[in-house]
Amino acid sequence: MAALTPRPRVEGADAFTVGTGFHRALDDGRIECTVCPRACRLREGQRGLCFVRARMGDQIVLTSYGRSSGFCIDPVEKKPLNHFLPGTPVLSFGTAGCNLACRFCQNWDISKSREIDTLSSQADAVTLAATAKRLGCNSIAFTYNDPTVFLEYAADCADAARDAGLKAIAVSAGYINAPARRELYSHMDAANIDLKAFTEDFYKRIAFASLRTVLDTLEYLVHETDVWTEITTLLIPGHNDSDAEIAAESAWIAEHLGPEVPLHFTAFHPDFKMRDVPPTPPATLRRARRIALDAGLRYVYTGNVHDPEGQTTVCTDCGEALIVRDWYRIDRYAVSDSGQCVRCGARVPGIFEGPAGDWGPKRQPIRIAAPSVSQR
């Protein structure tokens, strides 16, 4: 595997700190981070809201390069991606920090961690990709926290994965500015974007972000890149699960992205700062799925609940059950190696390369062998 070109070292910093190109100087002496719309304006030594991007001298640096957490081999459907290399194993991991502040965060122990040293293992990009290859994975996934905040590390890991013949997946909230967005997704093969709700009010009150930026990211991915894109909405009782909001979201996706973009409705569990909200009833997910299908979307799924009907991929031409799933196990696979319905020959949107994998529902934590940090 070819070595990656090391990233420039930052004078006076440790081996986990690299410079970034996403910042600008302000007249008052502060430096503004330009990765996301939050636009943190920092004085010397200050960190942004994400915690992992900080001011050192006349630049913004990433302080978590090569520090990763949660190494685990999962089925790719767990990202969730139902139309991308079905049934195959993916090496999943994250780092620390996040540029959103969701009150309902389901991974808050990682995304809100300030204990980078104790949380994270060390893994350079080449070693990580080689480990994924050795363990039989088809791809790597940046998940648990948002790759937006560690995009330099994510980009290098993705390049190393491609050199090893693997694909790279970003699981993201899509809250990112256009220049950083172009850089991050130029290295990715697939993405699942969390569309957390379909009102600006929810984004402001609950996620402390903006809906419009996320919609811009979705339109960019679907219309301006070759990145295979699926969408997830976590339905939170009483906050984003009304018929009207679900219908509006579904109609927007159908009109602006196209009816073939898969949409996943997943169940909320009480966590972080919203422990007083009850779990999502399975009936809510089934109702949302029906509304989205009625709005013209062709591939709508339910998640975090046992719902075989809501997890089955159906040919929209002839009605054949193409991929029958029981949780993350594939019980029937009727898609050709070239991505067509075996019954009628209709194209199935997605990335299909050969027969389905047989990884199943296993979740296998792993350690990265011989950790070292090589920078790019």
Annotate each PLM feature.
Residues 35, 49-52, 97-100, 104, ...:
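Short, cysteine/histidine-rich loop/knuckle motifs that typically chelate Zn2+
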Residues 122-283:
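Conserved AdoMet/S-adenosylmethionine-binding subsite of the radical SAM
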Residues 1-44, 239-376:
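Auxiliary Fe-S-binding modules of radical SAM enzymes
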Residues 33, 42, 51-52, 62-67, ...:
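Generic structural "secondary-structure junction" signal
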Residues 39-63, 107-117, 324-328, 348-355:
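Iron-sulfur (Fe-S) cluster-binding segments and ferredoxin-like electron-carrier domains
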Residues 6-89:
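N-terminal juxtadomain amphipathic helix
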Residues 55-190, 196, 360-367:
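Conserved Radical SAM active-site core
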Residues 46, 98, 199:
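A generic "binding-loop/recognition-motif" signal
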